[in-house]
């Protein structure tokens, strides 16, 4: 029997889930939080390159002059994203270096070395809400927390293998385990997306059940290949860098793979 279309885990999750109260609170907290962040003026190519290299996620407005309305638009959303670096450049050499031929807002992210552009009609019709949504949905990091917003960026990433750490963020061991998970993520940058799934969030139960995991088996690692729905799981007591590395290497080599082709096993996928 054929497998379902690829990437169904995240796509169907998006179509059936609303933002959890925790996610809404987090977005509100970031927009209401302290700080007086301002976009950095990037006057030459070297400055732009260093600016992008220093940030996990950077947003740059490339404008042909400094009077375009989008300049004030960037200023209006900066405080909503305390963990994103913002820059503005009107230097022709910088625009040429990044293949910019018209007013454009670009998001650069370290995790998959991606440049995503808002240009043309998308740029002309942009407002603060659309710009915020663009940043939110593409704000992927070495470790990205899984929710209805970030799932969009995960779905659109060119990296087809995703490693999930499924763990309750309220756990006393969470911060230490997350740190080691982040260290492991550096070993697979550009090859595997590392994702955190908070098992304490009710809306994540369907994503967890996709991997046939029970709450008693958590925390756990789950690895998933979007191109052909191959996946595998590993219940753990704690995150160890070497353990994560071996699990990922084994999956990349085709060891210990599971594939959901049985009709009775497709139920949870359909319901996601």
UniProtKB/Swiss-Prot annotation:
Major location (coarse): endoplasmic reticulum
Domain of life the protein comes from: Eukaryota
Signal peptide: 1-25
GO biological process assignments: protein folding; response to endoplasmic reticulum stress; response to unfolded protein
Subcellular location per the Swiss-Prot or TrEMBL entry: Endoplasmic reticulum lumen
GO CC field: endoplasmic reticulum; endoplasmic reticulum lumen
Region (PDIA3-binding site): 229-232
Chain span(s) of sequence motif Prevents secretion from ER: 269-272
Keywords: Endoplasmic reticulum, Glycoprotein, Signal, Unfolded protein response
Assembly: Interacts with PDIA3.
Family in the record: Belongs to the protein disulfide isomerase family.
Listed name of the protein: Endoplasmic reticulum resident protein 27
């Amino acid at each position: 029997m054929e497998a379902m279309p690829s990437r169904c885990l995240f796509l169907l999750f998006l179509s059936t889930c609303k933002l959890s109260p925790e996610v809404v609170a987090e977005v509100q907290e970031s927009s209401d939080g302290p700080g007086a962040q301002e976009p950095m003026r990037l006057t030459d190519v070297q400055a732009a390159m260093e600016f992008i290299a220093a940030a996990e996620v950077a947003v740059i407005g490339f404008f042909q002059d400094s009077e375009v309305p989008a300049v004030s638009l960037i200023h209006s959303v900066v405080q909503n994203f305390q963990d994103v670096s913002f820059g503005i450049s009107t230097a022709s050499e910088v625009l040429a270096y990044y293949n910019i031929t018209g007013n454009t807002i670009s998001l650069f992210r370290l995790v998959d070395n991606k440049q995503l552009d808002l240009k043309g009609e998308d740029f002309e019709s942009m407002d603060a809400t659309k710009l915020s949504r663009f940043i939110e949905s593409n704000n992927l990091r070495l470790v990205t927390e899984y929710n209805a917003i970030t799932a969009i960026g995960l779905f659109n990433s060119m990296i087809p293998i995703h490693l999930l750490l499924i763990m309750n963020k309220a756990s006393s061991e969470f911060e230490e385990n997350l740190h080691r998970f982040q260290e492991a993520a550096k070993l697979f940058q550009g090859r595997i997306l590392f994702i955190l799934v908070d098992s304490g969030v009710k809306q994540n139960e369907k994503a967890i059940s996709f991997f046939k995991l029970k709450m008693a088996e958590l925390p756990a690692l789950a690895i998933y290949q979007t191109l052909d729905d191959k996946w595998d799981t590993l219940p753990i007591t704690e995150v160890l860098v070497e353990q994560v590395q071996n699990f990922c290497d084994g999956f990349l080599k085709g060891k210990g793979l599971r594939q959901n082709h049985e009709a009775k096993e497709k139920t949870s996928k359909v319901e996601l």
